[in-house]
From Swiss-Prot:
Its cofactor is Mg(2+). The basic functional RuBisCO is composed of a large chain homodimer in a 'head-to-tail' conformation. In form I RuBisCO this homodimer is arranged in a barrel-like tetramer with the small subunits forming a tetrameric 'cap' on each end of the 'barrel'. This is Ribulose bisphosphate carboxylase large chain. The record marks K334 as: Transition state stabilizer. It comes from Angiopteris lygodiifolia. Its EC number is 4.1.1.39. Binds 1 Mg(2+) ion per subunit. The lineage of its organism: Eukaryota, Viridiplantae, Streptophyta, Embryophyta, Tracheophyta.
């Protein structure tokens, strides 16, 4: 950093620039149960010591600025400052470190992910002394998490609403994602739900475009829901995307969905913003609506391993802000996601208590106390041959969502839904009988296809489809 210069005054104030580490690097500090803890992967500029870089992260994301200021003397910096309390080198990487920072709870507004992120992942990410900076994990203490409502309903309450237990829930994103008229869209929804799926879904970029205005879509989808429910005797849902250009318009769409009797709405929580998402989550709890969350834009933030923010942090933020489902990758499909890393943040979404486990990318033990859990949604390039692996990886408390893997069936949408339902129930039955899904998965699907022509046709179409690319963001 710049050389230290000071100018004394008659009031005990020393103007000038000081090294950050003089005040913000405190390896002797013992963290408190009420601290928010952060693990940053940092790459300092050449010549910047890691202790100075870690202290700069702590300072610039809490009380510090680049020079000493008069008003430091009007408050207690020791009470409010962030502290870099540990630094460790990243194995196998040159000039890269994990900096651990503790933040006092009083720095953050209660119940506001927006305020928390404005500090922790704010201007510090553009700091010139750092070549790159990534927030790897966050420990949210119960003293802070209890100020959030969290998911509108949670896993158990949703199962009770749907009266569906003991298996993953099945969904489908309607394709093509853009261009269908509202009536044809509703027809596709009806066919998929009648065929055996639990949910259908608006694609994340379906809002209210000229080819299909939101109100028309909501009306035709509601008709499809009620017709499929009457024919199957099962509760059905369609994720009606309420995301809009303003919070007021978003709420208008959610209110209309509730008036139609729809059980669930949807929000793009990153493009829509945390303030809008939390507002919608509160409305959904108050009015009995489930809330499906899409993570559009996440890869802009989380895919590069040296800079940005890991999705496990975005997942924790979503659980606090509120959502009953959130997309979480597939491990086996077309989208990025390493198995152990994915399971690490899936546990952070579903479980009450998650132990520190660096082999899964979990830097801190996280205690959610009584906050409801979130269904992870596996979606993106998956089909019936993936069903055993998906069931084994994600378990029952998940939503498995097949868009092209339903609508691409050679016989049509309803047979595509039948194929997925048959494959899912075959995998659940085989697992419950003690069979090894990882080893016997293909055999289980082949056996089930002998008595399901819909599944047999799907198996033939997608037998050669694989997405075998190396994951970029690895541990």
């Amino acid at each position: 950093m710049s050389p230290q210069t000071e100018t004394k005054t008659g009031f005990g104030f020393k103007a000038g620039v000081k090294d950050y580490r003089l005040n913000y690097y405190t390896p002797e500090y013992e963290t408190k149960d009420t601290d928010i803890l952060a693990a940053f992967r940092m790459t300092p500029q050449p010549g910047v010591p890691p202790e100075e870089a870690g202290a700069a992260v702590a300072a610039e994301s809490s009380t510090g600025t680049w020079t000493t200021v008069w008003t430091d003397g009007l408050t207690s910096l020791d009470r409010y400052k962030g502290r870099c309390y540990d630094i460790e080198p990243v194995a196998g990487e040159e000039n890269q470190y994990i900096a651990y920072v503790a933040y006092p709870l009083d720095l953050f507004e209660e119940g506001s992910v927006t305020n928390m992120f404005t500090s922790i992942v704010g201007n510090v990410f553009g700091f010139k002394a750092l070549r790159a900076l990534r927030l790897e994990d966050l420990r949210v203490p119960p003293a802070y998490s209890k100020t959030f409502q969290g998911p509108p309903h949670g896993i158990q309450a949703e199962r009770d609403k749907l009266n569906k237990y003991g298996r993953p829930l099945l969904g489908c994103t309607i394709k093509p994602k853009l261009g269908l008229s509202a009536k044809n869209y509703g027809r596709a929804v009806y066919e998929c739900l009648r065929g055996g799926l639990d949910f259908t879904k608006d694609d994340e970029n379906v809002n209210s475009q000229p080819f299909m205005r939101w109100r028309d879509r909501f009306l035709f989808v509601a008709e499809a829901l009620f017709k499929s429910q009457a024919e199957t005797g099962e509760v059905k849902g369609h994720y009606l995307n309420a995301t809009a250009g303003t919070c007021e318009e978003m709420m208008k769409r959610a209110i209309f969905a509730r008036e139609l009797g729809a059980p669930i709405v949807m929000h793009d929580y990153l493009t829509g913003g945390f303030t809008a998402n939390t507002s919608l989550a509160h409305y959904c709890r108050d009015n009995g609506l489930l809330l499906h969350i899409h993570r559009a834009m996440h890869a802009v933030i989380d895919r590069q391993r040296n800079h940005g923010m890991h999705f496990r942090v975005l997942a924790k933020a979503l659980r606090m802000s509120g959502g009953d489902h959130v997309h979480a990758g597939t491990v086996v499909g077309k989208l990025e996601g390493e198995r152990e890393v994915t399971l690490g943040f899936v546990d952070s979404l579903r479980d009450d208590y998650i132990e520190k486990d660096r082999s899964r990318g979990i830097y801190f033990t996280q205690d959610w106390v009584s906050m409801p859990g979130v269904f992870p949604v596996a979606s993106g390039g998956i089909h019936v041959w993936h069903m055993p692996a998906l069931t084994e990886i994600f378990g029952d408390d998940s939503v498995l969502q097949f868009g092209g893997g339903t609508l691409g069936h050679p016989w049509g949408n309803a047979p595509g839904a039948v194929a997925n339902r048959v494959a899912s129930e075959a995998c659940v039955q085989a697992r419950n009988e003690g069979r090894d899904l990882a080893r016997e998965g293909n055999e289980i699907i082949r056996e089930a296809s002998k008595w399901s022509p819909e599944l047999a046709a799907a198996c033939e179409v997608w037998k050669e489809i694989k997405f075998e690319f190396e994951t970029i963001d690895t541990l």
